[in-house]
Amino acid sequence: MADPLALARALVACPSVTPRDAGALDVLESALIALGFRCVRLPFGAEGGERVDNLYARRGGAGPCFGFAGHTDVVPAGDGWSRPPFGAEVVDGALVGRGAADMKGGIACFVAAVARLISGPDSTGSISRHDPTGSIALLITGDEEGPALHGTRKVLEWMEGAGERMDLCLVGEPTNPEGLGDMIKIGRRGSLTATVTLLGRAGHVAYPHLADNPLHRLSTLTGLLLAETLDDGTAHFQPSSLQLTSIDVGNPAANVIPAKATLRFNIRFNDRHSGESLSAWIRARCLAACDGDESGFSLVLEHSGDAFLTPPGPLSDLIATACQAVTGRRPELSTSGGTSDARFIRSHCPVAEFGLVGRTMHKPDERVAVADLEALSEIYRRVLVGFFEAPC
């Protein structure tokens, strides 16, 4: 398992589109057992519904515990591929397949790093055996690309009950925009999605006094939402952003006033806000658009997590130093991009993210350079050595 490409190909060959596992965790579990890990499979799901499989693995006993988290589920392949999306082919020096970058390749690199750490020299003979005093844990879910209800957050709850703890955690998401060594994620913005339905009364456009047009209030609400800047950013976060995503009336007739109109928008917010504070902010503007009438609208809010930050320090320094030693580049520390399961882990232990290049993730012909698989494996190995020599 010291070769990341072999394991990455085996994982990519599993069509594990959320919530299907398709054998991916079996492949990973076999590799980890061979390295001395104790593995526990943790299927979770709603009563009577489909269950999602997860894996927790640990090697070692007392002492500091280094955690690694990731996911084996992938988004649907879609169309436009030049190679089979689950063929796991190597083409022009790159592994092509859904999940190669996001993030089966990263998982394979971490397993290869552990194998090299504990099993002796690499092909160049430059790595000496280093069986750490302490432990290594992996938290791998099959529910990250989907609703994320029965994955990492449920495994963390199980860990608390079982007395399993990590001293820190590295999430292997593809954090690098263009090249390996670009970026370490030390936090993420929060996310809040709102669906507002403005209620009115249908009627003929020639007789507006007999109807109540909700589109006019929707227009007012849109203006209120966009009229002010949420903030100007903070030391580690860019400014919060509100983006309209949908206006739906369901009215094909130009001479009919609709009975309702629905607006959807998302706010990606920094650490100056919380889901609770922004929910109140949205509700106040809905009330204002409806002249204080609570019966004039319905509001559904989906809060996937607040902004969080692991301040620059021992964990990010450990990753950056290892990356610079391998690539010659010291990564930028960033909180940009979308959400990840790090939002759940942050309440368990310090967490940071670093993985492969994400330029092609979720796209046709998703790919990762074979050379990057090798380089990331060496970065992860150096991170492990650094941690066990001087735990963060």
Curated annotation (Swiss-Prot):
Write out the residues that bind Zn(2+) 1: H71, D102, E173
Its quaternary structure? Homodimer.
Q: Which gene encodes it?
A: dapE
Q: SUPFAM superfamilies this protein is in?
A: Bacterial exopeptidase dimerisation domain, Zn-dependent exopeptidases
> Which UniProt keywords are given for this protein, alphabetically ordered?
Amino-acid biosynthesis, Cobalt, Diaminopimelate biosynthesis, Hydrolase, Lysine biosynthesis, Metal-binding, Zinc
Question: Signal sequence: where?
Answer: none
**Cofactor binding, per record:** Binds 2 Zn(2+) or Co(2+) ions per subunit.
Which domain of life does the protein's organism represent?
A: Bacteria
Function text? Catalyzes the hydrolysis of N-succinyl-L,L-diaminopimelic acid (SDAP), forming succinate and LL-2,6-diaminopimelate (DAP), an intermediate involved in the bacterial biosynthesis of lysine and meso-diaminopimelic acid, an essential component of bacterial cell walls.
Pathway note = Amino-acid biosynthesis; L-lysine biosynthesis via DAP pathway; LL-2,6-diaminopimelate from (S)-tetrahydrodipicolinate (succinylase route): step 3/3
Enzyme class, top EC level, equals: hydrolase
**Protein name, per record:** Succinyl-diaminopimelate desuccinylase
What GO biological process terms does the UniProt entry carry, in alphabetical order?
Answer: diaminopimelate biosynthetic process; L-arginine biosynthetic process; lysine biosynthetic process via diaminopimelate
What are this entry's molecular-function GO terms? acetylornithine deacetylase activity; cobalt ion binding; succinyl-diaminopimelate desuccinylase activity; zinc ion binding
Q: Which InterPro entries match?
A: Bact_exopeptidase_dim_dom, DapE_proteobac, Peptidase_M20, Peptidase_M20_dimer, Peptidase_M20A
Q: According to its UniProt record, which cofactors does this protein need?
A: Zn(2+); Co(2+)
Would you identify the family this protein belongs to, as annotated?
Belongs to the peptidase M20A family. DapE subfamily.
Binding-site residues, Zn(2+) 2: D102, E145, H362
Which source organism does the UniProt entry give?
A: Rhodospirillum rubrum (strain ATCC 11170 / ATH 1.1.1 / DSM 467 / LMG 4362 / NCIMB 8255 / S1)
Instruction: Provide the E.C. number(s) assigned to this enzyme.
Output: 3.5.1.18
Q: Which reaction does it catalyse?
A: N-succinyl-(2S,6S)-2,6-diaminopimelate + H2O = (2S,6S)-2,6-diaminopimelate + succinate
Q: Where is the active site?
A: D73, E144 (proton acceptor)
